[in-house]
């Protein structure tokens, strides 16, 4: 019996150099037990480049930005051409732009993965010109099946788009199951790690209120953040707090990020909402205790392997981060719980269940 053929399009590999969604599709491409085609002309994606099996022209970030307009048009034309051919069993678009509905041959099924519902839950942070909700709704409504990456995402899909429950499969993300020791960064001896964006529903400002309170009592404590560069308002916030000299920003690659987790007192995740929360698993693999919000999908993913707090209550955050900064017994307990928990989340299992979803569509 011949293997299925699945077609991924260009969208996420055009948008992300690094990032959770492109990592998800990269891992599926590596692990799926089927033929995977990728329609992509030009990319700056790190994962494809590092694999040694990049099916597109790779450009460094700077020339890629200069040529962004023409590249977007070219990648779109490459995907449209491949989709029209129809020589695949399943089409799996890598993001929500419904451009493909005009060129997908009649009768060719597609599956869509929904990674979160933050545009629907927090429209105030995305502006009136935001197209994402309309795009997502159209793409989801016409899909043969939908993959949700958590129970919470499934519930939000039903709530906002009235999707029939039986049309949705829950398939968790995975993570590589080995820690890679690295020691290339010079880091402070004692720090809290914050990973990712800091705007709006990410709830960084509330966390910083708690951190500031603790750092004024513990003069050795630092904060390290990854993600986008500081905004002017953040720099002013740090200056006003009197803690600027103990706050660092690092734009970390995968190896450096591993070291940041490995040497941190704790990783903090104060977000009000996430579709899944890959950094939780990253912390577990790297033996880093986690203090996190008790909202959204976090209890679903972390279970007993986290120090929970109420994300909108600075005092609750303060108590959690204070405990993990000082209580070695609790830190060790959470490190061991995290190592046990993370074994449930492998890319092999993600790929296996995704293949089962494809089979449901083909057999319908």
Q: What are these model-predicted stretches?
A:
Residues 1-364:
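Carbohydrate transferase catalytic cores enriched for Leloir-type hexosyltransferases
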């Amino acid at each position: 019996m011949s293997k299925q053929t699945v077609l991924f399009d260009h969208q996420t590999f055009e948008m992300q150099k690094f990032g959770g969604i492109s990592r998800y599709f990269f891992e599926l491409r590596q692990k799926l037990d089927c033929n995977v085609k990728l329609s992509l002309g030009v990319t700056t994606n790190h994962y494809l480049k590092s694999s040694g099996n990049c099916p597109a022209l790779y450009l460094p970030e700077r020339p890629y930005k200069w040529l962004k307009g023409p590249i977007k048009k070219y990648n779109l034309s490459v995907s449209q051409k491949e989709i029209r051919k129809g020589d695949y069993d399943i089409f799996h678009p890598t993001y929500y732009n419904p451009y493909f509905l005009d060129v997908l041959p009649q009768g060719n099924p597609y599956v869509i993965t929904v990674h979160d519902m933050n545009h629907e839950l927090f429209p105030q942070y995305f502006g009136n010109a935001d197209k994402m909700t309309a795009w997502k709704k159209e793409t989801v409504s016409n899909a043969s099946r939908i993959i949700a990456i958590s129970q919470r995402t499934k519930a939000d899909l039903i709530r906002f788009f009235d999707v029939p429950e039986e049309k949705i499969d829950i398939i968790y993300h995975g993570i590589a199951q080995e820690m890679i020791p690295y020691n290339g960064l010079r880091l402070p001896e004692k720090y809290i790690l914050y990973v990712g964006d800091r705007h709006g529903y990410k709830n960084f400002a509330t966390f910083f209120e708690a951190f500031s309170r603790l750092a004024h009592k513990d003069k050795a404590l630092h904060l390290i953040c990854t993600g986008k560069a500081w905004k002017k308002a953040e720099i002013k916030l740090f200056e006003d707090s009197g803690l600027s000299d103990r706050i660092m920003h690092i734009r970390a690659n995968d190896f450096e990020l591993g070291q940041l987790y490995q040497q941190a007192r704790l990783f903090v995740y104060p977000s009000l909402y996430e579709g899944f929360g890959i950094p939780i698993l990253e912390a577990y693999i790297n033996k880093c205790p986690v203090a996190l919000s008790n909202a959204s999908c976090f209890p679903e993913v972390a279970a007993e392997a986290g120090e929970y707090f109420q994300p909108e209550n600075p005092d609750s955050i303060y108590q959690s981060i204070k405990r993990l900064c000082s209580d070695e017994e609790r830190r060790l307990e959470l490190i061991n719980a995290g190592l046990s928990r993370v074994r449930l989340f492998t890319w092999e299992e993600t790929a296996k269940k995704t293949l089962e979803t494809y089979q449901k569509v083909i057999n319908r």
